[in-house]
From Swiss-Prot:
InterPro entries: Band_7, Band_7/SPFH_dom_sf
Bilayer disposition of the protein: Peripheral membrane protein
GO cellular component, one term: phagolysosome
Name of the protein: Vacuolin-A
A biological process term (GO) from this entry: establishment of protein localization to plasma membrane
Entry keyword annotation includes Membrane: yes
Stretches assigned to coiled coil: 482-539
Keyword Membrane in record: yes
Origin: domain of life: Eukaryota
Entry's family note: Belongs to the vacuolin family.
Keywords: Coiled coil, Endosome, Lysosome, Membrane
Subcellular location: Endosome membrane; Lysosome
Pfam family, one: Band_7
Amino acid sequence: MIEGSGSKTPKRNSDEISVKSLSIHEANTLSSEHEHESGNEELTLSQIVIRSDFANESSERQSKIILDRFNQGIGKNSAFTDSPALGRGLSRVDVSYFVMGHRNQVAELYDPRGQRFSTVLTPDPTVNIKYVGPVSKTAHYFGAYGKHVLNVPAGHYAKAFSKNRPVLYGEGPHVIIDPTFQFDENNGFVNQQEPFIEHSTINILRIPAGKIAKVWIGTQPHILESRRDPYVFVDAQFKLVSPDGAKKAQLFESSSCTFVEHGSIKRIIPHTGEVAITYNNGILTIIPTPKDGKPVIIDSPTHNFEGFISTSLQTCLFPSKETKQQALADNKSALADEINLKIFQTRDSLRVGVVLVVAFKIVDPELAITKLGKEGIINHIENVSFADMGKAIQLSTLQEIMYFNSIKPGQATNDDSVQTIQDRVKSHLARDLFDYGVELSRLQIETMKVLDTEIAKKLAGQSVTSAEFTTKQATLVKEYDIKTTEARLKAETDNIALEQRNKAIISESQAKLSSAQREAESLLITAEAQKKASELQGELYTKYPILAEIELARIKAEALKNATLYITPQDAGAFMNSPLVYFDKMMNANNTIQQKKN
């Protein structure tokens, strides 16, 4: 089959030559007999899907290419003419249509472009020219006599056959010259985004994120992980295994499944806090949680997966559910206490029923499974726990058991040498379980019941009395706490008030001290100023003695300011020569000197 190919053609104009110069593709038909398995190279979509080499051309260009490729080898012997004889013109067709005819079953396309046309009239009886009819230029498929045009819609593939082998065409127009070409227009197109495209021996798988696919190729199983590019297989022995009754959207398994088995392949994902149990040719193999976060893949028909076992802390109540069911099966008339409790006899011959709480962790899974088996670990822990607890109860009186049961395992007591029954049993049981790869974390009597009715009533009465005493004691303690709290609050309030008063007194004293200090500093400054003034005045009087005399006269004048002078006639002459007569002048001169100093 050849797309757009042909035998020798007559000379054409430059436009026709440029059209033919486009790449010519021969359909890639692959054998299903494992020819593609040479080497490790995988097939890709580009190897099996035939691309259109003129899908991106303009509509006019595409029409011309289709005409030239479809009509290769016809040359001047066209079956159509645009100059019809009178009365031979055919019905006009829209410009969006080709018309198709044939000359002796050699198909031909013609584009009348809305003009009149007709078939060629020939007198040769050996030439048979027929008009087939109009075909839309955008029709998905048309053709006749080994010539075909295929217009694949966007986002689709076209499934066809050539030489009885499947072929796939990509979106866009294709011209196929092939007498063995087969195409079913009703079922031939498929969406490119389908998760699984199957076309005879061609298989395309698109595995969504979070999914895996289980497939067979011949007798070999494969588990395919999700990836961006699709998987492509051309093999008649390819088979996709999907869950029973699965629809197209459910063809795949979840990639988060902890265990997926497909033929001899086992895909295991142990979670944190557990390990996988496998047997490789009968030899126990423990698979821990992978550090790289990837699934563990085992491809061996003799390496079998048994299950998972927890390595994190587990807490169990004994008797277990299975033990209770077995007790009921053994004795249909058994009482509820005989089923729900494990019954022991004390040293003073009293029957008590207990429920144990055991917390443990498997630290060596290989050792534990080797010695006990996967299903026997819990049973062994239950049996040895009851065996050790029963031995301890048989060696103790009811009073001792009740006393020790009121103290939790590991709780501090006044006597360090005293151990509870749980502690004694735990230490012995821990050593026993360690030999089997199990670490005991806790052992405690969860429930204890005296089965003797009369003794149980007496114990109940004692419990009531003890409860009343405990309640009264708790009330007294509470009242004491309240009184203590009130006294403490009052003392704290008084202390706060006293502190506030002390702070006020201290603040007032500090204020008075500061005021006195400032007043003393002021007096010192004043005295110092007066001292300096006196020193300056003394220096002035020393330098200018006349000023001292003037000052002395001023002092005398001040002393005589309010005095009354009585002058006798005989003293009048002496008074006129006295300095007192010039007192006013002296005072004025003194004032002038003082102003200059200032």
